[in-house]
Amino acid sequence: MNRNKENEILETTLAIAEKNYPEAYRFLLNAYEESPSSLGPQTFYFLACLADGPGTALEWLRKAIQENNWWYRPEVLEDDDLAALKNDAAFLSLKAISDDRYAAAASKSTALFSWKKKMADNLFLAIHGNTQNGDVARADWEPIVGTSGLWQLETVQSAEPDGYGTYRWSYDNISYLPVANSMESLQNEGYHKIACGGFSAGCDMLLRAVTFSPAACDLLILQSPWIPVLQDHSEDVVRAISQKNIKLRILCGAEDVDCLPKAEQLYAVAKQAGCNVALTVQENTRHQFPAQPYHV
């Protein structure tokens, strides 16, 4: 499956669903019917949530869990959009199967750091968002980093499963540690420049790493930043960025109603603290990378 293509389709689906659930369902169903193999667990979940009745919703979940052997984080199957299935015996059976698979995956999952050795003068470390993985991060950032050979692109993948094939970050004192440890391990490898880029929750992990550990970099790029760390630690964050002389670049879609306020808040406090910071608001863009990539 092509997770990047799927993410774009699902973002469009969300935009339509804000005004019309049936229309959003038809759009996503058409996308699925055009290319079933390119869409995965999230598409089936969205189709179940948008379905016009519990029978159709249950069938999508049956296809995902029973036929495709996928699974979801337990909380996901407790969504209000699936409330009509809450006491359905067939649904509860599927959920039990999914929950068991999640528990098995979580018990053996570990963080993955792709770096093996120095292969270029500069290094770019990409951090995925929730319901993503290291491969998605690499595909998202490759057009931005480029293929000139000037930058070596590496990734960190969370240890916490989100669903089948995807991972998530928690906003606590533990989840960010693989990011911090990876950043620290690179600092004495002889790179001319080290840049880090995060998408959504990945931005929060980078800010926590810079703030609560010795980790540092030359450039920090935050795309569509979902950054709860600002709620209690905004002063600590900008102090760390300033003291470590990190260039901060914040980019967010003009239509990203959840993340744009936080992006603007971070820009304001960083600017006030004297940080080298810039904010780019990307027109006609929601919670996603822009159609036309920018460059490091």
Which positions does each model-derived feature cover?
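Serine-hydrolase catalytic machinery in alpha/beta-hydrolase-like enzymes
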Residues: 122-188
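Short beta-strand immediately N-terminal to the catalytic nucleophile in serine-hydrolase-like folds
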Residues: 196-198, 223
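Gly/Ala-rich beta-loop-alpha elbow adjacent to hydrolase catalytic centers
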Residues: 198-206
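Short beta-strand-to-loop junctions in surface cap/lid or active-site-entrance loops
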Residues: 108-121
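A conserved short beta-strand
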Residues: 215-228
